[in-house]
Amino acid sequence: MAQKLWGSCLFSLFMAALAQETLNPQKSKVDCNKGVTGTVYEYGANTIDGGEFVNFQQYAGKHILFVNVASFCGLTATYPELNTLQEELKPFNVTVLGFPCNQFGKQEPGKNSEILLGLKYVRPGGGYVPNFQLFEKGDVNGDNEQKVFSFLKNSCPPTSELFGSPEHLFWDPMKVHDIRWNFEKFLVGPDGVPVMRWFHHTPVRIVQSDIMEYLNQTSTQ
């Protein structure tokens, strides 16, 4: 009888775990598609001060982490963590690029000229200055999305099956590969081809660990 009860208990635990995995609508990370046509080097963007157009070709040979950012988001604390990632992975030829966007909860309402001041004195505040390049505010989804994000999204599966509440999402039309919220991340390899994509809630320390694991794997190939 005890063996039957123990077996039944194990089966119930297994089924509960399986159900939890099945019901979980997002993944912390996904690998991008194989055989992608094109590279990020075909695109570029203006720096946040509008003083320079940067062709992403200048990052050829580097690993690039593209991040859509916002100043008044619950995830804005990610900013200092991105500074740490940039500092610790710079010796490994990794560079972070940030793209302010106001499409998720209207959480980046300021002008380009106001964003850096807001980061320094409001959120995260405390004199914070990003040690990575920020670009002009723009769309990452919808009819007016930046072309580089069209390329990144079409190169990688979405990290979640679900979108947030429609009243907090400001673009049209919505597509399955769209970015779900602020602080999604895309890693691009030194050949300009997307490698990985992370869910916005994935901790930066996990992103950094995933990148290091990828770098170790590629260095031995």
Swiss-Prot record:
Keyword terms of this UniProt record: Oxidoreductase, Peroxidase, Secreted, Signal
PROSITE patterns xref list: GLUTATHIONE_PEROXID_1 (PS00460), GLUTATHIONE_PEROXID_2 (PS00763), GLUTATHIONE_PEROXID_3 (PS51355)
Reactions performed catalytically: 2 glutathione + H2O2 = glutathione disulfide + 2 H2O
GO MF annotations, alphabetized: glutathione peroxidase activity
Secreted listed as a keyword: yes
CDD domains, A to Z: GSH_Peroxidase (cd00340)
Localisation per UniProt entry: Secreted
GO CC annotations, alphabetized: extracellular region
Active site: 73
Naturally occurring in which organism (per UniProt): Mus musculus (Mouse)
Signal sequence region: 1-19
Designated name of the protein: Glutathione peroxidase 6
